[in-house]
Amino acid sequence: MDLLSTIVIGLIFINTLGAIITVFREPREISATWAWLLVLVFFPFLGFFIYFFFGRKISKDRIFDLKSQDTFGIRKLAEMQLEELEHDNTFFEDLYLKELAVLFLESDESVITKGNQVEIITTGQVKFTQLKEDLRNAKDHIHIGYYIFNDDELGRELLEILIEKAQQGVEVLVLYDALGSRFTKQKFWKKLHEAGGRSEAFFGYTFGIINLRMNYRNHRKIVVIDGKIGYVGGFNIGDEYLGKGKLGQWRDTHLRIRGNAVLSLQARFFIDWNATVSERYQKTFLPRYFPTLECLGDTSMQIVSTGPDNDYQKIKMGFVKMIYMAKKSIDIQTPYFIPDESVLEALQVAALSGVKVRIMVPCKPDHPFVYRATEYYCRNLLKDGVEIYLYEEGFLHAKTMVVDGVASTVGTSNFDMRSFRLNFEINAFIYDEEISCKLQDIFEKDIENCLLADEAYFKKQSRWKKLKQKFSRLLSPIL
């Protein structure tokens, strides 16, 4: 063996040993461990660089910051509701819905709110027209949290409204994700700051150039106006959400809420805001921000949050519980379908038990590896009787699930491992037959713009594409 061969073998050994030590020094799920080993072993040096920014777990100090907020008596209210549900079977006629609500009360202290008025929004034109009107009518405060807040025509138009309201004395706070809004420079916010408003980047860049926590993204989209009107769902702020991007028409689902669920959105915003800003700018859970609200509708719901700061993958647990409680049908819309074993098995059990399971995903990719992994998982569910629909009328970005037309969820969480484990997400879980049926009707209408992806469809794909699907599946725990 010559010297060069010895050096190469030595470097391979050192790289492999370093990969094993690096990955196993932090507890993580087995699938993610193997995926990171694959990256570190087969991409020497580059793999370690990628791991440094994307693979390290969130620090315990940061977890403490996110967990330690005083949440305006929410814990006590959740405990009261748990006790009430234990002795009262009249609120939930369906035992499975009661069990779902208890799951969130136990794991997330997510209180059940009643008497909400909910509007379902599926186009950017409707969403942003209504949002602008609500912002202009704000009297006391505007609290906004988005993954993406772009410096483009729509972003600048909304910013002008925020500046105007700040000049009028309305409290304006904007929280945006540093990675999602990476193309929006600090100077974009200058006039808002001069008017008295504030903007902050969640998990911002160190020294303005390096983001050491870029793998942990605040993917939530929250708007709260005067503690009375709230928005949550899939739309970010940018021209592409009006159909002006390269992906064409944008199909998403968002909720406009009036009622007590808005106070849950407010509490979530405060927790995220206070964990981001210095103590000087932290907000106190004052009655001003949590007004007493009249009953405006008939919808009951829970606002559920999840993230790497939690011990439980709460939204995923809710998805699994809903799937297992289905008796007739499950309709899922998601741009990215990369389920872990628990979700995959739940869907297989449902389909093989006679439940009609339909999954709708986009027909075009916006992330190559993610889309190929989505194709892999979709194809493998066909054998279990699951129907797969590819949305062709633009890009499908909605994140919804409807079960039996009686329960549903809308929010920011995709059906993928990133949303389950790494992102900070928020979803509304809705206990209302009318709203659930509306979402089901929307699904049916969307099918008119879909291609049914059956076995024949996938058989036509090239071997190269199938190879990319299998390779992407190996990386799925870290995509």
Model region roles, listed by residue range:
Residues M1-M317, K321, M325, V349, ...:
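N-terminal localization/anchoring segments of enzymes in phospholipid and broader phosphate metabolism
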Residues A326, Y336-R358, P362, H367:
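Helical hairpin unit composed of two closely spaced alpha helices linked by a short loop
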Residues Q333:
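Short alpha-helical functional segments enriched in proximate histidine and acidic residues
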Residues S342-L344, Y371-A373, V403:
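Histidine/acidic-residue-rich catalytic or RNA/ligand-binding cores of hydrolases
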Residues I388-E392:
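Active-site donor-binding acidic/aromatic loop of nucleotide-activated sugar
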Residues K399:
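Catalytic-core elements of nucleic-acid end-processing and repair enzymes
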